[in-house]
Amino acid sequence: MSTFLLTWIIMTVALSVTLFLMPQQTNAARAFFVFGDSLVDSGNNNYLVTTARADSPPYGIDYPTGRPTGRFSNGLNLPDIISEQIGSEPTLPILSPELTGEKLLIGANFASAGIGILNDTGVQFLNILRIGRQFELFQEYQERVSEIIGSDKTQQLVNGALVLMTLGGNDFVNNYFFPISTRRRQSSLGEFSQLLISEYKKILTSLYELGARRVMVTGTGPLGCVPAELASSGSVNGECAPEAQQAAAIFNPLLVQMLQGLNREIGSDVFIGANAFNTNADFINNPQRFGFVTSKVACCGQGAYNGQGVCTPLSTLCSDRNAYAFWDPFHPTEKATRLIVQQIMTGSVEYMNPMNLSTIMALDSRI
């Protein structure tokens, strides 16, 4: 055998072994499913007859395409950045006609701006995907995937997936605190919060029954500190609206208790609590520390704190989005969202309970 041929055989075998041992990122990457409201909607409302939409400029001004996508952000949103951090492609909206074939195996985004825990939250936005409908679409998704890879592998894909659930803020902002609110006349803030937690537990139990086994559940941020609440409460010096802050202070601890109780009932840490209040409060309370000029005024909007109405092509628009913690009256900029994801990935129990996402990924990789 010639030296050349022997060398060629050795190199070929070595390359084959190397390729065999290399992690197969595309096949091994876990699916990612997203449920919730405008904080995580990646464009489903574009396909609906609704007033809750972000499909016109200047939304998306800093997105890679420079165009609005339906994300309530100047650029990437929370699911995008989580996907980026875990080495996965961004999930497509479940209503997108592009979500077909192998793209289904990456996961899907079911979120819809305007929805809440309660079905009467967001009625002013007309046609939105309420959480029950999101779950129906999740069932239909699983049927579609089963046609591609079979039912057993579909169950494995869903069981092994990472799931993000973001609900609750709209139930306060666009229901309880909404002008002429029936809910507010019927119950105290504490009673309403208890109702939300009771209904949320039913929602998360249904999600578990649909196959979810790793679910990150975000609480509400500092509701009284968003520009919309500063404007509507008549804040003079940027003080957060006290009643909305009280709502978050009541709701979030109840949510943690409920998640811990659910995990005990199941016998496993299925539900991971992400403390959205703390992750947001860090840069809201000390914006300069994180490179922001302001955490009170929205980049895009009008009126006091740019917090009145919604962001439109006619709104006042800041020139440097990285100097602002809030993009519009309700939603953070991409830069602020990256700070939130940083704590989701590596934060202490002050931010993630009982563990952060990096720890989850490391533990699950050993299974």
Curated annotation (Swiss-Prot):
Q: Where is the signal peptide?
A: 1-28
Name the top EC class.
hydrolase
Q: Which protein, by its recorded name, is this?
A: GDSL esterase/lipase At4g28780
For this chain's UniProt record, which GO biological process terms are given? Answer: lipid catabolic process
Select a single GO molecular function from the record's annotations and give it: hydrolase activity, acting on ester bonds
Entry keyword set: Glycoprotein, Hydrolase, Lipid degradation, Lipid metabolism, Secreted, Signal
Going by the UniProt annotation, this protein carries glycans at 119, 356
